[in-house]
Curated annotation (Swiss-Prot):
Main localization, broad class: cytoplasm
Residues where FMN binds: K46, S47, N130, K167, I195, G224, G252, G253, G274, T275
Cofactor(s) in the UniProt record: FMN
Superkingdom field: Eukaryota
Subcellular location, record wording: Cytoplasm
Record protein name field: Dihydroorotate dehydrogenase (fumarate)
Annotated positions binding substrate: K46, N70, S71, M72, G73, L74, N130, N196, S197
One GO CC term, this protein: cytoplasm
Taxonomic lineage from the root: Eukaryota, Fungi, Dikarya, Ascomycota, Saccharomycotina
Family matches, as PANTHER family: DIHYDROOROTATE DEHYDROGENASE (FUMARATE), DIHYDROOROTATE DEHYDROGENASE (QUINONE), MITOCHONDRIAL-RELATED
Any GO BP: 'de novo' UMP biosynthetic process
GO molecular function, one term: dihydroorotate dehydrogenase (fumarate) activity
Catalytic activity annotation: (S)-dihydroorotate + fumarate = orotate + succinate
Length: 314
């Protein structure tokens, strides 16, 4: 019996667990339409702010041998642009599974106001609150401040009743996994997305003896193969600490079907692709779908649930 990638996530059924990562190939309606027409099981919009943002000066994204470095600074078309798109798509494609919608305000108040707009709208998809952008100068990553994270979630869940996930930065200490999981378990979160890019890396052009991205004197978020072990560790750490009702979306270092399998084995329910999607474009989803099926067939698995989260210890 051939492997099935059918994925149940919340109350939705997707053909496979593959998605784009917010920020990649989702800036415009054209790119979003291309995602919708691809073999991705689901897709997510660009992280939006209240108003349109140009982001950081270029060059701000560079592909490097094992991944990427970026300091985009949240360029986007503004929340109304993306909300109009998803509402129209709901109307014209009523039988499609839920769309993911990402927001990343510059302040608590901005996030609250955007989430109120989503709550008051007819959007019936899944919202992702990005608490982990490392590339806005002068703006720390919210999710490294545990008290502030709790303050935001307290305010959000006073009024937000639709499915909500949060995107987290990578953590590197067991105490931090424990603290953050303890906070998140207090709320009716739909999911946690781990990880955003590893913040403030530095990549050097030896020939020019210079950095390769302009913002922040060359410091930027690292993605791709460099971050896969960190991403897998975060997926596993939260999978084993969070309430079973809080699902995991695994992001970081996915280049092959084997990488997808590893994220699922660590406990992810869905996975998002960023760096490699930039390099290959939307045909990557067809390749990853095929390669994941090949891995599963070789191992004798017919469904993802047969192995998801069942990582063996020594």
């Amino acid at each position: 019996m051939p492997a099935s990638l059918t994925t149940k996530f919340l109350n939705q059924t997707y053909e496979n667990p593959l998605m784009n990562a917010s920020g990649v190939h989702c800036m415009t309606t054209k790119e979003l339409d291309e995602l919708a027409a691809s073999r991705a099981g689901a897709f997510i919009t660009k992280s939006s702010t209240t108003l349109e943002r140009a982001g950081n000066p270029e060059p701000r994204y560079v592909s490097v041998p094992l991944g990427s470095i970026n300091s985009m600074g949240l360029p986007n078309q503004g929340i109304d642009y993306y909300l109009e798109y998803v509402l129209e798509r709901q109307r014209t494609h009523p039988n499609e599974p839920a769309i993911f919608f990402s927001v990343a305000g510059m302040s608590i108040d901005e996030n609250i106001n955007m989430l109120r707009k989503i709550q008051d709208s007819e959007f019936h998809g899944i919202t992702e609150l990005n608490l982990s952008c490392p590339n806005v100068p002068g703006k720390p990553q919210v999710a490294y401040d545990f008290d502030l994270t709790k303050e935001i979630l307290d305010k959000v869940f006073q009024f937000f009743k639709k499915p909500l996930g949060i995107k987290l930065p990578p953590y590197f200490d067991f105490a931090h996994f424990d603290i953050m999981a303890g906070i998140l378990n207090q709320y009716p979160l739909a999911y946690v997305n781990s990880i955003n890019s590893v913040g403030n890396g530095l990549y050097i052009d030896v020939d020019k003896e210079s950095v390769v991205v302009k913002p922040k004197n060359g410091f930027g978020g690292i993605g791709g193969e460099y971050v896969k072990p960190t991403a897998l560790a975060n997926v596993r750490a939260f999978y084993t600490r969070l309430n079973p009702s809080i699902k995991i979306v695994g992001t970081g270092g996915i280049r092959t079907g084997k990488d997808v399998f590893e994220h699922l084995l660590c406990g992810a329910s869905m996975v998002q692709i960023g760096t490699e999607l930039v390099k290959e474009g939307v045909p990557i989803f067809e390749r990853l779908e095929r390669e994941l099926k090949e891995v599963m067939d070789k191992k004798g698995y017919t469904t993802i649930e047969e192995f998801r989260g069942k990582l063996n210890s020594l």
